[in-house]
């Protein structure tokens, strides 16, 4: 390597020397005489004698004789390389300078050429445009000149007509400046109203399936008045309310104002509505609030009533008033939910009801608008009163909200308030053509003037006492801030001081906090309800909270979340997961166990019942053949083995219908249930779970809980066996609320599609379901077989989750059972209920009369009953039922569908817990859980859909009992996995219909056995005796048509129960 480097260096030096001449090395500094030459053949260097400098070239001052420079061969390589490097740098610099100079000259010449060409091209282009443009004008001028020269008279006439037309137009515009706008906008307004307003809503009508009542009753404080046309015919209604500014005002629907006259039934006076001034008016919300001329309240004989604004309206019963033959009638209604910016109301109305108010006790909730046409909505809608600070709402902050929650979400309330604020500002800026409004004029009320003068000249001492009394008045817990409540300012900017001011509503605020005003029942300001959420979190809208309040709220939230986290860890610790030895029922596997918390006992016949049977042999004959089932884990496992085996046997032979068949049945079911379209839960209206909306949903869910029901697994571990222990504890209720919210949050985020039953529980998406034998009498044949009726009890948190997701739909089905195939809401306790049900059946079946239906029911309907229906429900049936529910949700969201899908996954893939703590995971999805919140609703709809799959034109069901069209193919039920039996008589819900008013219970003997062997009134406990007597009279009511049997039972059961001294 070193040798190669040396050779390369020598070759490089040789190349430099051989190219010295060509490289320009003949520089004067190196032009020595006698320069040496190199011999390529020998490689030796030879040098001539050292050249001598000329003597005249040396400086004259130097007298010393200089020595000639040594030859190049005597110099060192370093000096030679230095010289070569310097020579190369100078030559490169010279070449670079010459190159740059030539390149610059070339670029400059090119730039001058391009610039000259560009300027010449631009000049040519511009002159071309000028020539073309000028040519066009010149041509046009020549044509016009030729036209005028050829048609002189015609052109003159056209010019004169154009001038005359222009003068006429300017004159008409000066005479009526707004006439063109009016002529242009009027048709557009008519087209807009016809195309949009009347398309979405129409006249009032009766809600299909809703049965209300009407009684003669006057409106509260005579606050409802009639609106008439100019000719005296009926138009609508208006309602008098007391504003927070101290004035009275009328509230009515905006579409009722045109040409209306406010008419008093008492005095007969009429006041044109055009004399009322609107302080709030919204065509979109169809509501107007108007204040009237002086003394209008006295002329109409009305008083201002209290009202409730949109942000505080809750679900519950209501009423409205109408005039019928000159008499006021009160009609029932139900506040159901939200519909866009309105409130959906279940009520039966008719044309001319617009503007009538809906009342909760003596509080106005809103006014009737009409009936929505979109989405086949089966309810009327109510226009609500927006919250306008100082006018319809006070400048006070309340600490708590309605017990059952609000109808509107926070976003909807804010939107209503924003629109109301803009409308008020718009009206405040309004000026009439005279630049003065009637409200700016002073009233000529002499009495009021004297009253005002007296108030002005009042002694200072008395005024000071009054002020002192007001200051020392005890403040209520609902008042956080008492801001100045200023009167409303009118268009001119002046305060209307001359108007008679009513009593300041301070006392009303105090009554509100005590539950005497505002929302009664479902609208009360319940301070005890603060446990459900943060106090003040749903407080009066539009008032900002202080930093201290925000800090307190955050502290409560942190405490609630921490408590829920601790409780979750506590409950998770009781599970011992893992496979266990021993056999298990088919379709299940043992996946773990928990400690034993339940110790059910087998019931036996009571001494009281045995004594009655000995004394009354006829009673013994009636109750023979029944007995109490066994209880405990062994009985549960035995019955589970039998029912699970039958379930899987039917499932193996069943086939799932095709996609087209399922789609057809789903669409037909949605059409049959179209009257039950409801809103999605408030908590899932956004893309993420909303805490504020959840608070409203959970309030309603908690209110509907059965307090004496069991809490289930794992909450029984805490030692409170019933719902009451959690709901009525103000410390545990916030924890329960947070636990429910956390579960919904996990359901919205988890990937649950491929999870097993135990994984769903381990991930916190659901709880195990407690399995136990129902404590009711069984037939002896079932007792001998060991096939007991099993109950699957869902936990408290899962109950609340299901109620939050489905309570709107289930409650709507109960309210409107007359217009939907599902009948969970009807009863047969009275003859009237029996006749009402048969009338519904007669209309659906097409029978000419109820009598004909009862006499020849086989021609019009077919009563069927499914054996073991809960165990026969396949998972695809639950999926189709959920699809129907989603399609019947008006404002459904992806989050709502996600939560419902998670709930369906959990309910179809459950972990059962026996009484001894054994956990059994379901390996085959399906089976309707009997203790679920949706069991009655979903079973009824699945039963109807099964009839549709079998070709029935119509069907109605109550759980597994059904009445369906005669054209139903019963053989198709086997392919669906159902075992169906056809009744010989007209039977439905364990009752046989003998005639239009007679429904005889089928299980009379079973009821008697449970009555005499389920109670022991001889114990002497007053509560036991009271419950026994209530059960006796309930059974006698069911058997009311068999008077002979009722008389005997009354003699056998009632006297003996009260003879014991206690």
From Swiss-Prot:
Residues 859-974 form the RdRp catalytic domain. Precursor from which the RNA-dependent RNA polymerase (RdRp) is probably released. RNA-dependent RNA polymerase plays an essential role in virus replication (Potential). This is Protein P1-P2. The record marks 204-205, 399-400 as: Cleavage. Keywords: Hydrolase, Membrane, Multifunctional enzyme, Nucleotide-binding, Nucleotidyltransferase, Protease, RNA-directed RNA polymerase, Serine protease, Signal, Transferase, Transmembrane, Transmembrane helix, Viral RNA replication. It catalyses: RNA(n) + a ribonucleoside 5'-triphosphate = RNA(n+1) + diphosphate. It comes from the Viruses.
């Amino acid at each position: 390597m070193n040798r190669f480097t040396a050779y390369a260096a020598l070759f490089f030096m040789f190349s430099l020397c051989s190219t010295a001449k060509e490289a320009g090395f003949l520089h004067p500094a190196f032009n020595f005489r006698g320069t040496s030459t190199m011999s390529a053949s020998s490689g030796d260097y030879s040098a001539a004698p050292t050249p001598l400098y000329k003597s005249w070239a040396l400086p004259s001052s130097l007298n010393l004789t200089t020595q000639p420079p040594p030859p190049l061969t005597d110099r060192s390589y370093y000096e030679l390389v230095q010289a070569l490097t310097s020579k190369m740098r100078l030559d490169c610099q010279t070449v670079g300078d010459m190159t740059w100079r030539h390149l610059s000259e070339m670029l400059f010449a090119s730039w001058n050429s391009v610039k000259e060409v560009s300027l010449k091209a631009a000049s040519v282009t511009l002159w071309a445009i000028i020539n073309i443009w000028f040519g066009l004008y010149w041509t046009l001028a020549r044509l016009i000149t030729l036209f005028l020269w050829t048609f002189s008279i015609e052109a003159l006439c056209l010019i004169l007509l154009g001038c005359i037309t222009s003068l006429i137009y300017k004159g008409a515009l000066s005479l009526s400046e707004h006439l063109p706008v009016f002529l242009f906008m009027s048709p557009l307004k008519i087209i807009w109203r016809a195309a949009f307003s009347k398309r979405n809503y129409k006249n009032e009508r009766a809600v299909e399936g809703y049965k209300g009542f009407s009684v003669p009753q006057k409106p509260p404080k005579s606050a409802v008045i009639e609106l008439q046309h100019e000719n005296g015919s009926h138009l609508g209604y208006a309602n008098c309310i007391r504003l927070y500014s101290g004035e009275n005002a009328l509230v009515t629907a905006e579409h009722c104002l045109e040409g209306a006259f406010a008419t008093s039934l008492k005095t007969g006076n009429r006041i044109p509505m055009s004399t009322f001034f609107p302080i709030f008016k919204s065509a979109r919300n169809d509501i107007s609030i108007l204040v009237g001329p002086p003394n209008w309240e006295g002329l109409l004989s009305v008083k201002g009533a209290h009202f409730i604004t949109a942000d505080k309206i809750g679900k519950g019963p209501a009423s409205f008033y109408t005039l019928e033959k000159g008499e006021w009638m009160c009609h029932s209604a139900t506040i159901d939910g939200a519909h866009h910016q309105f409130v959906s109301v279940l009520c039966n109305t008719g044309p001319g009801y617009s503007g009538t108010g809906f009342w909760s006790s003596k509080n106005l909730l809103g006014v009737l608008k009409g009936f929505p046409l979109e989405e086949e909505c089966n309810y009327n809608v109510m226009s609500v009163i927006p919250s306008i600070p100082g006018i319809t709402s006070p400048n006070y902050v309340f600490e708590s909200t309605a017990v059952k929650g609000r109808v509107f979400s926070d976003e909807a309330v804010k939107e209503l308030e924003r629109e109301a604020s803009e409308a008020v500002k718009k009206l405040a800026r309004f000026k009439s053509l005279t630049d003065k409004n009637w409200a700016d004029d002073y009233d000529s009320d002499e009495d009021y003037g004297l009253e005002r003068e007296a108030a002005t000249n009042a002694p200072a001492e008395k005024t000071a006492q009054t002020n002192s009394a007001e200051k020392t008045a005890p403040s209520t817990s609902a008042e956080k801030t008492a801001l100045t409540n200023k009167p409303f300012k009118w268009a001119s900017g002046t305060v209307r001081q001359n108007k008679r001011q009513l009593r300041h509503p301070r006392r009303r605020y105090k009554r509100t906090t005590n539950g005497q005003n505002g929302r009664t029942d479902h609208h009360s300001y319940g301070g005890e309800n603060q446990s459900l959420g943060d106090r003040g979190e749903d407080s009066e809208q539009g008032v900002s909270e202080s930093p201290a309040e925000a800090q307190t709220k955050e502290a409560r939230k942190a405490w609630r979340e921490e408590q829920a986290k601790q409780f979750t860890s506590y409950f998770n610790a009781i599970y011992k997961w893992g496979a266990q030895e021993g056999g298990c029922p088919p379709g299940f596997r043992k996946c773990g166990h928990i400690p034993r918390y339940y110790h059910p006992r087998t019931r036996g016949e009571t001494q009281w019942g045995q004594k009655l049977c000995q004394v009354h042999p006829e009673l013994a004959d009636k109750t023979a053949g029944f007995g109490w089932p066994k209880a405990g884990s062994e009985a549960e496992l035995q019955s589970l083995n039998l029912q699970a085996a039958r379930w899987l046997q039917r499932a193996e032979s069943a086939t799932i219908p095709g996609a087209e068949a399922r789609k057809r049945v789903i669409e037909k079911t949605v059409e049959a249930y179209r009257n039950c379209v409801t809103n999605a839960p408030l908590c899932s209206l956004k893309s993420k779970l909303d805490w504020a909306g959840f608070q409203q949903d959970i309030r309603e869910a908690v209110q509907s809980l059965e307090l004496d029901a069991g809490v289930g697994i794992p909450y029984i571990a805490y030692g409170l066996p019933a719902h009451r222990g959690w709901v009525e504890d103000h410390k545990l209720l916030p924890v329960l609320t947070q636990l429910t919210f956390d579960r919904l949050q996990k359901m919205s985020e988890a990937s649950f599609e491929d999870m097993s039953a135990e994984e769903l529980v381990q991930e916190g998406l659901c709880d195990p379901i407690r399995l136990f034998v129902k404590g009711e009498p069984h037939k002896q044949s079932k007792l001998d077989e060991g096939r007991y009726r099993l109950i699957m009890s869902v936990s408290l948190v899962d109950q609340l989750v299901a109620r939050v997701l489905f309570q709107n739909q289930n409650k709507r089905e109960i309210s409107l059972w007359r217009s939907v195939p599902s009948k969970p809401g009807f009863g047969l306790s009275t003859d009237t209920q029996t006749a009402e049900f048969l009338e519904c059946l007669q209309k659906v079946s097409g029978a000419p009369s109820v009598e004909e239906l009862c006499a020849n029911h086989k021609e019009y309907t077919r009563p069927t009953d499914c054996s073991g229906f809960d165990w026969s429900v396949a998972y695809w049936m639950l999926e189709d039922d959920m699809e129907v529910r989603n399609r019947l949700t008006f404002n459904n969201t992806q989050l709502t569908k996600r939560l419902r899908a998670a709930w369906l996954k959990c309910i179809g893939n459950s972990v059962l817990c026996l009484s001894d703590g054994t956990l059994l995971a379901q390996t085959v999805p399906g089976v309707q859980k009997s203790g679920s919140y949706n069991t009655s609703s979903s079973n009824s709809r699945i039963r109807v859909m099964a009839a549709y799959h079998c070709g029935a034109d119509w069907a109605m069901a109550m759980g597994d009992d059904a009445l369906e069209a005669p054209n139903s193919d019963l053989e198709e039920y086997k392919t669906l996995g159902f075992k169906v039996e056809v009744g010989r008589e007209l039977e439905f819900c364990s009752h046989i219909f003998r005639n239009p008013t007679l429904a005889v219970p089928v299980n009379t003997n079973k009821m008697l056995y449970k009555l005499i062997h389920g109670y022991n009134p001889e114990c002497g406990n007053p509560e036991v005796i009271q419950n026994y007597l209530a059960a006796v009279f309930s059974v006698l009511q069911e058997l009311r048509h068999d008077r002979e049997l009722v008389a005997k039972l009354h003699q056998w059961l009632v006297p003996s129960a009260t003879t014991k001294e206690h």
